[in-house]
UniProtKB/Swiss-Prot annotation:
Ca(2+) 1 binds at residues 56, 58, 60, 62, 67. There are three different troponin C in lobster. InterPro entries: CALM/Myosin/TropC-like, EF-hand-dom_pair, EF_Hand_1_Ca_BS, EF_hand_dom. Ca(2+) 2 binds at residues 132, 134, 136, 138, 143. GO terms for molecular function: calcium ion binding. SMART domains: EFh (SM00054). This is Troponin C, isoform 2B. The lineage of its organism: Eukaryota, Metazoa, Ecdysozoa, Arthropoda, Crustacea. Keywords: Acetylation, Calcium, Metal-binding, Muscle protein, Repeat. Pfam families: EF-hand_7. GO terms for cellular component: myosin II complex. Belongs to the troponin C family. The modification N-acetylmethionine is found at residue 1.
Amino acid sequence: MDSLDAEQLSALQKAFDSFDTDSKGFITPETVGVILRMMGVKISEKNLQEVISETDEDGSGELEFEEFVELAAKFLIEEDEEALKAELREAFRVYDRGGNGYITTDVLKEILRELDNRLTEEDLDSIIEEVDEDGSGTLDFNEFMQMMNG
């Protein structure tokens, strides 16, 4: 549960509670599918059953809140990563002025200066040296992603 923020946990608790109408402390696998689909998760029935059986630690056939959160977290985190990748791809596209599939290290320096104006020229050169492993003077999208993801 560490990987979810308070807002996400609260939303999951509300969804769980609204489907646990008898306050029994668990929801059925069918309900899990409904909740995930309401959250915008696209999952086949087969994949849903596989994920539920992996998560249903006590083998009860139902999911307690903690199990439900563990299951939902997999999808929420995955979606966050996909959204981040899409945003980074768009940022890369904007800076790839020639549409060549790469940005120059000079453009990268501009980006880094915009992100942190306290970076010295030495700092920038050090960063460039680290991320431009092949010394080409350019970064393709994968190199850019590696740098942005730390």
